[in-house]
């Protein structure tokens, strides 16, 4: 079975899709655990990694390439973790960190802005205007981050194998569609893929420590 990445905008219910999908397939479901693993592997304070991957790049980041260093730690930890296969990863930028991994199934989950606003209102008990501002800020930071490090927009559908919109489609519908795709030969973790994964992980580890 494959390695699956779930990318989503904030408050788009991608976490729920990932967790249900992992249960359906019998996969590991991982997210922020990778930050902790990177922190332990490279002896970097966890809070520094969190800021590096969640905050939009500052002027200093653009000059010193500070974010690149922290992202290298996370990428190395993630590549090491997914070598076992049978993983659903819904954390930070999986579709980008694993873009060189053959056969990884990259999924994008979308939701209508009205549904996202109501999700924030319900979860955080704020007004609709405040919810809209929070979503806009989060989306803007993700766009800036992706462009700074990879020169891509997370909304570019060419980055993904599957793009699904929650709303017209239920969570169970989305899980079913992804599970069906996950069984296709193109997305299986073959011995050749495992060899490539090991090589990528070794290279990423060396780059992170350099």
Question: Each predicted region: which residue ranges?
Answer:
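Glycine-rich phosphate-binding P-loop
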Residues: 5-21
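ATP-dependent small-molecule kinase phosphotransfer cores
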Residues: 35-86, 93, 126
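Conserved nucleotide-binding/hydrolysis micro-motifs of P-loop NTPases
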Residues: 94-95, 111-117, 168-170
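Small-molecule kinase domains that catalyze NTP-dependent phosphoryl transfer to phosphate-bearing small molecules
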Residues: 128-172, 200, 207
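N-terminal targeting leaders
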Residues: 180-210
């Amino acid at each position: 079975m494959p390695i699956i990445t779930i990318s989503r905008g904030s408050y788009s219910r991608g976490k729920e899709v990932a967790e249900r999908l992992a249960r359906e397939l019998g996969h590991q479901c991982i997210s922020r655990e990778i930050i902790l693993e990177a922190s332990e592997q490279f002896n970097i304070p966890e809070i520094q990694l969190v800021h590096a991957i969640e905050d939009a790049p500052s002027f200093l980041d653009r000059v010193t390439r500070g974010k690149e260093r922290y992202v290298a730690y996370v990428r190395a930890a993630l590549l090491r973790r997914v070598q076992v296969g049978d993983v659903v990863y819904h954390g930070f930028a999986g579709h980008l960190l694993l873009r060189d991994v053959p056969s990884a199934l990259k999924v994008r989950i979308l939701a209508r802005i009205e549904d996202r606003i109501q999700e924030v209102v319900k979860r955080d008990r704020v007004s609709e205007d405040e919810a809209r501002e929070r979503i806009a800020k989060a989306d803007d930071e993700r766009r800036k981050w992706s462009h700074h490090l990879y020169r891509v927009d997370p909304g570019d559908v060419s980055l993904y194998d599957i793009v699904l919109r929650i709303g017209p489609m239920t969570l169970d519908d989305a899980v079913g569609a992804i599970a069906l795709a996950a069984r296709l030969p193109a997305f299986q973790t073959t011995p050749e893929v495992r060899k490539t994964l090991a090589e990528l992980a070794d290279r990423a580890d060396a780059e992170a420590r350099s």
